[in-house]
Regions:
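Short Cys/His-rich micro-motifs in 6-15 aa windows
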Residues: 829-831
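Short, acidic/hydrophobic/Gly-rich beta-strand patch recurrent on exposed beta strands
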Residues: 84-88, 105, 160-165, 761-766, ...
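Charge-lined substrate channels and their catalytic hotspots, especially those that engage the 3′ end
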Residues: 1-336, 343-388, 425-428, 738, ...
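Acidic, glycine/serine/threonine-rich low-complexity segments
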Residues: 208, 695-696
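Electropositive polyanion-binding surfaces
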Residues: 200, 228, 233, 238-240, ...
């Protein structure tokens, strides 16, 4: 495979640091498949921002474009027609990076033919003192939406589709004859959405007919003679211009927007979630044998005689992990974590592997899932079903009574799970339920040992400063028609805790082992928060009388051109924005604050705000530690059925095990994990001779996967994870809005979760539904927004609406198109939240 570094070095040598496709083919001496490989690789590098597409089949280094004041970034549109471009840091010169710290405003007439989400090339015209800028779009580099889902309408000049995503601001014209799809894609029930019957034949679709998944059933093809008001998916055939709307053709008819199941179909297409398995991948899955050869069993470590169990939710169908705990003769605990050996069946470069990499992760909706692997594997051959022999990768850890790791073994193994347990069932046993303890009598002692060890491991994490936000999550119940029946608070019991602690331990153990061997792998990293976010949180926390304890933050003040222009000639002082510099912050600071606010009225809001101040965790080929877990090394090893990075870690580990003289790694190869100091502590890290040091970026490492490919997989997987999370969140919000439509006029207790210049957001206490109280609806006084304290204050009455305040609101109106809820305030005299400005 052609290395990316070769391409980058070759382009860097060119006079303008740019080269054409044919030039690269000629000068690199590529032929046949190598040409196709180069084309595919160039497209991937453009998608990641490593290269810029600067003309017809011509590519340049981002720095070359930056020299001409051109940078690449992702366009976010506003429904009023203007947009913002978030710059790609790779395309910024050091000088521009120092000045440009915000996004780039694009006026409507400077959007050109770009659409929301496109990767675009921007010409910067002005950088403001606050780090934001203005510019114009030169051209799109890569399109984000080859297809668009929307509502079909008939107009005076023919059909058009109004996109459901309001950020796609232009309607898509549908020429005559392009309204009905002639051929259906492989049905979305092709072993792709859990709960549906497999159907694998490609069929010619009758005019206006459609197949879609309805929960556990497959809809019959429906006849549509009139498309008015129906949801359709459209392929863009002609991109927009400054004077012309985009054009397209209908590829799928999904049904009416309010039909059961259509909201999921809309979400799948809006977020471009891969949901059709290629025929080659399905064929590989069907040909995979569940029979384990005797030679394979003999070479693996045999755990079949132990009472190993899986513990999952009631509706789970893919069982990644199984666990077992026992006491050793020396009084220590032995924790066994067995993970489905997916890498045994999904081999590198296979059709299954390519599709799994494309998907990156399984996506879970309330009534179904879009799995990463076909159901033959995800719910059968790879799933650790009870009383069935299954291949696993095993992490067996010996731990003392402080939870410290004494020794461990990693091996390829085989298990036979004795019971498929649920969190509810295990919790009942541990809570002393007589019926549950009788039913699972042979396992009661094991579950009690698991509980004891989990509590020890939790205390160990607390000692090192690990942050634990125990935030409630909503649980949605549906009726037989698939409509929301209720929303309730999720219950997190001891069974959830023990599985969480065991998986964390296994992930950390594997990460440290691979790092100590200097083997290239993927890590799950969580970097320390930005100074600006810490500063913003400290300002808000101070109004409640709390602090993270970071001390006085060094800041510098800037003025924006807009503020200077507004103040000119008025005699008013120009407003200054405070921008913090670097700040020393540790996980323990967050942990101590969570302990202080535990059980207090302000706990919920401050916990949310602390969480928002942190960065998102992501995947990386470079180990940068995990801030929230206060872990020096961490990876994802425990869910290879539903996460592609875990599958990669399995491949790396299996290669390590098979290279060794035996099938397990002994502790002698790795010093005590705790010897390595936290990267956020003030203590010095031990020298390399005494610890497993993190390799420098792009160091030559061993292992089956090169650093460049690992980097590529890490970025792809991080994007896929964010895409899945966004899709799951949006669908959930849509269902909440639909649930509240019949409750307009009803009043509820709520909590103010965010205060802005245009109003404040309230989350209903019992329903986890959020809505906005617009500032202009507070008509009893003239209210102003105070940015420093995040408060809205009445100028005459001095009424205050502030973060964390309990409030009674009425459901005023619902916007089903934008999926937004508007509340109206009921209480006459808002009261500050308890604990406000309390000194600690």
């Amino acid at each position: 495979m052609l290395p990316e570094s070769t391409i980058l070095k070759h382009i860097a040598k060119q006079p303008k640091r740019a080269a054409g496709f044919k030039q690269l083919v000629r000068e690199l001496g590529l032929r046949g498949d190598e040409r196709r490989e180069l084309d595919s690789l160039l497209q991937k590098m453009v998608a990641r921002g490593t290269l810029l597409s600067v003309g017809s089949d011509r590519y340049a280094l981002p720095a070359a474009a930056a020299d001409k004041n051109l940078i690449a970034g992702r366009l976010t549109m506003h429904r009023d027609g203007f947009g913002f471009v978030i710059p790609d840091s790779k395309s910024l010169t050091p000088a521009l990076k120092a000045k440009l710290t915000g996004d780039i405003f694009i006026a409507p007439h400077l959007i050109g033919n770009a659409m929301h989400g496109d990767l675009v090339l921007v010409d910067i015209s002005n950088v403001r003192p606050d780090g934001r800028a203005e510019g114009r779009i030169v051209r799109p580099v890569m399109r984000a939406h080859p297809t668009v889902v929307g509502i079909f309408h008939y107009g005076s000049r023919g059909g058009y589709v109004r996109p459901i995503d309001s950020k796609i601001t232009q309607e898509i014209l549908i020429p005559a004859g392009m309204e009905f799809p002639s051929v259906s894609p492989v049905s979305s029930v092709v072993n792709e959405v859990e709960g549906a019957e497999p159907q694998r034949t490609r069929r010619t679709q009758r005019k206006g007919s459609v197949d879609r998944v309805l929960g556990d059933e497959v809809a019959r093809p429906a006849e549509w003679d009139d498309l008015e008001g129906l949801v359709v998916d459209v392929e863009i055939t002609d991109w927009p211009s400054p004077t012309q709307n985009p054009r397209g053709r209908v590829t799928e008819i999904l049904g009416r927007e309010d039909d059961f199941g259509v909201d999921v179909e809309i979400t799948i297409r809006k977020f471009h979630l891969p949901h059709h398995f290629p025929a080659a991948a399905l064929e590989e899955a069907q040909e995979t044998s569940a029979v384990i050869p005797s030679a394979e069993l003999e070479r693996r470590r045999d755990f079949r005689g132990l009472p190993i169990v899986t513990i999952d939710g009631e509706t789970a169908r893919d069982f990644d992990d199984a666990v077992y705990v026992r006491m050793l003769e020396n009084g220590n605990f032995e924790l066994q974590v067995h993970i489905a050996d997916v890498a045994q069946y999904v081999t590198p470069g296979s059709a299954l592997d390519q599709e799994a990499r494309l998907r990156g992760t399984s996506v879970y909706f309330p009534d179904r899932a879009v799995p990463m692997l076909p159901l033959e594997l995800s719910t059968d051959i790879c799933s650790l079903r009870p009383q069935v022999e299954r291949l696993v990768l095993s992490c067996v850890m010996e731990m003392d009574h402080r939870g410290e790791l004494v020794s461990y073994e990693l091996s390829e193994g085989v298990i036979r799970s004795v019971e498929r347990m649920t969190y509810t069932g295990v919790n009942a046993v541990l809570e002393g339920d007589a019926a549950a303890r009788s039913r699972y009598a042979p396992l009661v002692a094991t579950f009690e040992l698991m509980r004891d060890l989990a509590l020890i491991l939790n205390r160990k994490r607390e000692r090192r400063g690990s942050i634990d936000f125990d935030l409630p999550e909503p649980v949605i119940e549906f009726d037989e028609l698939g409509l929301m029946k209720s929303i309730s608070r999720s219950e997190r019991n001891i069974a959830h805790r023990l599985i969480e602690e065991f998986m964390l331990s296994a992930n950390e153990c594997v990460a440290h082992d691979l790092e100590s061997r200097h083997v290239g792998s993927l890590y799950r990293i969580h970097e320390k928060p930005d100074a600006k976010r810490v500063y913003d949180f400290e300002v808000i926390a101070a109004t409640f009388g709390y602090s993270l304890g970071v001390g006085a933050l060094p800041i510098h003040r800037v003025q924006t051109k807009t503020d200077r222009r507004a103040a000119y000639g008025t005699g008013k002082r120009v407003r200054e924005i405070e921008v913090p510099k670097e700040v020393h912050i540790t996980p323990r600071m967050y942990q101590k604050l969570t302990e202080k606010i535990a059980g207090k009225p302000e706990e919920r809001i401050l916990s949310y705000l602390m969480l928002r101040s942190l960065k998102q965790a992501r995947y990386s080929e470079e180990n940068l530690g995990h801030f929230a877990l206060a872990a020096t090394s961490y990876t994802h090893f425990t869910s290879p059925i539903r996460r592609y990075p875990d599958l990669i870690v399995h491949r790396v580990l299996k290669d390590v095990l098979r290279q060794g003289s035996s099938q397990h790694v002994s502790q002698s190869l790795h010093p005590r994990i705790e010897e390595k100091a936290s990267p956020w502590s003030k203590r010095r890290v031990l020298p390399d001779s005494a610890r497993a040091g993190a390799p420098a970026p792009h160091t030559a490492l061993g292992g089956p996967i090169g650093v460049e490919e690992l980097h590529e997989i890490a970025e792809e997987s991080s994007r896929a994870e964010r895409r899945a999370a966004d899709a799951e969140r949006e669908l959930m919000e849509g269902k909440k809005v639909k649930f509240m439509q019949d409750r307009v006029g009803e009043d509820f207790d709520g909590l103010i979760t965010s205060v802005t210049k245009f109003g404040f957001f309230v989350e209903l206490t019992d329903l986890f539904v959020e809505g906005l109280v617009p500032l202009n609806t507070l008509t009893d006084d003239r209210y102003t927004y105070h940015e420093n304290t995040r408060e809205i204050i009445g100028q005459r009455s001095r009424k205050i609406y502030s973060l964390g305040q309990k409030i009674r609101v009425l459901v005023d109106r619902i916007d089903p198109v934008e999926k937004k809820i508007q509340f109206a305030v009921l209480e006459e005299e808002p009261v500050r939240a308890k604990g406000k400005r309390k000194k600690h």
